[in-house]
C-alpha cells in the first residue's frame, strides 16, 4: 500500500510522528512533494480530499510539529483525514513487534494492518468507542467545564464505553458518574472519528429525568443548566459536541419562540 514518493507526486501531506503532525505555517502542507523535501520518502495513500490524494509519511520534522487539534477549524473532512493519518502513524510505530511472540512485524500490502513474521498474528488499529450526549431540560441544556478544558469552554458530557457495556448503558453510567442525574428518551444522532487518541464518538440527545447536579471533581470543574439563548463559550464548529448543542438550541427555539 505504500511506495516511494516521486518528483511529480502532489496532494495533501500528513507527516506524522508520536501523535504529532507537521504543520508548516500552521497548516497542513499541500502541493508538490518537491516543495516539502519529501521526494524519496515512503508514503501511504490514505484517502482523497477535493480530488487530491492525501498521503501519510511516517517522519519527524525538527520544526513545526503540532497537534491535530490545530486543524480542527478546517473542513471536517480534511480534519478527519488528518486524524486518520495521525492514528495510523501511531499504530505503525507502536506495532513493530508482535505482542504474542515478540518477533518483528511488517505492514500488510492489502489493508491497514500489521502482520507477525513468525506466528502470522494480524493486528488492526484499535478504536475506542465513546459516547457523547446533549441533555435537555425544558429550555435549557446541561453544559460542563471539564478539568482538561481550562480555557473556559463548556461542552456536553462524554466518556468511554466500558467492556461488556452497550452504548445506552454507557450514556446512563457516564451521566450519573459525572453529574449525578438520570436521563430518559435517549436518541442516537450521529458519530465522529476523534483522534484523541483513537476514539469514535457516538452522539446522542437525551431528556432530563431526575436528580440534582453533583459533579465528579476529578472530571469536571463545574456544570449547570444553561438557557438556549444564554450560553457560555462553546466547542468549535465542526465538532460533534457543537453539533449536539446547536441541535438542542434549534429544538428549544422551535418550542419557545
Curated annotation (Swiss-Prot):
SUPFAM superfamilies: Nudix. Residues 125-248 form the Nudix hydrolase domain. One of its GO terms (biological process) is NADH metabolic process. Its cofactor is Mg(2+); Mn(2+); Zn(2+). A divalent metal cation 2 binds at residue 174. It catalyses: a 5'-end NAD(+)-phospho-ribonucleoside in mRNA + H2O = a 5'-end phospho-adenosine-phospho-ribonucleoside in mRNA + beta-nicotinamide D-ribonucleotide + 2 H(+); NAD(+) + H2O = beta-nicotinamide D-ribonucleotide + AMP + 2 H(+); NADH + H2O = reduced beta-nicotinamide D-ribonucleotide + AMP + 2 H(+). Its EC number is 3.6.1.-, 3.6.1.22. InterPro entries: NAD-cap_RNA_hydrolase_NudC, NudC-like_C, NUDIX_hydrolase-like_dom_sf, NUDIX_hydrolase_CS, NUDIX_hydrolase_dom, RNA_Hydrolase_NudC, Znr_NADH_PPase. A divalent metal cation 1 binds at residues 158, 178, 219. One of its GO terms (molecular function) is zinc ion binding. A divalent metal cation 3 binds at residues 174, 178, 219. Zn(2+) binds at residues 98, 101, 116, 119. It holds the Pfam family Zn_ribbon_NUD. Disulfide bonds: none annotated. Belongs to the Nudix hydrolase family. NudC subfamily. HAMAP family: Nudix_NudC. This is NAD-capped RNA hydrolase NudC. It comes from Citrobacter koseri (strain ATCC BAA-895 / CDC 4225-83 / SGSC4696). The gene is nudC.
Amino acid at each position: 500500500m505504500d511506495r516511494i514518493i516521486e518528483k511529480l507526486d502532489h496532494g495533501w501531506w500528513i507527516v506524522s510522528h508520536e501523535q504529532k503532525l507537521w504543520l508548516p505555517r500552521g497548516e497542513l502542507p499541500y502541493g508538490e512533494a518537491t516543495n516539502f523535501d519529501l521526494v524519496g520518502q515512503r508514503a501511504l495513500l490514505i484517502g482523497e480530499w477535493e480530488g487530491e490524494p492525501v498521503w501519510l509519511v511516517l517522519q519527524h520534522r525538527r520544526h513545526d510539529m503540532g497537534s491535530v487539534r490545530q486543524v480542527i477549524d478546517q473542513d471536517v473532512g480534511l480534519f478527519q483525514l488528518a486524524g486518520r493519518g495521525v492514528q495510523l502513524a501511531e499504530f505503525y510505530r507502536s506495532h513493530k513487534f508482535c505482542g504474542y511472540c515478540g518477533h518483528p512485524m511488517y505492514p500488510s500490502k492489502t489493508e491497514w494492518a500489521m502482520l507477525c513474521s513468525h506466528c502470522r498474528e494480524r493486528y488492526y488499529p484499535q478504536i475506542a468507542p465513546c459516547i457523547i450526549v446533549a441533555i435537555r431540560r425544558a429550555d435549557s441544556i446541561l453544559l460542563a467545564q471539564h478539568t482538561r478544558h481550562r480555557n473556559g469552554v463548556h461542552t456536553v458530557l462524554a466518556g468511554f464505553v466500558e467492556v461488556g457495556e452497550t452504548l445506552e448503558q454507557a450514556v446512563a453510567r457516564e451521566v450519573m458518574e459525572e453529574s449525578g442525574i438520570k436521563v430518559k428518551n435517549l436518541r442516537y444522532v450521529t458519530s465522529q472519528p476523534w483522534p484523541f487518541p483513537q476514539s469514535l464518538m457516538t452522539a446522542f440527545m437525551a431528556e432530563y429525568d431526575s436528580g440534582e447536579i453533583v459533579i465528579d471533581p476529578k472530571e469536571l470543574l463545574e456544570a449547570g443548566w444553561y438557557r438556549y439563548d444564554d450560553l457560555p463559550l462553546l466547542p468549535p464548529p465542526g465538532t460533534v459536541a457543537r453539533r449536539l448543542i446547536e441541535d438542542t438550541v434549534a429544538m428549544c427555539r422551535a418550542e419557545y419562540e
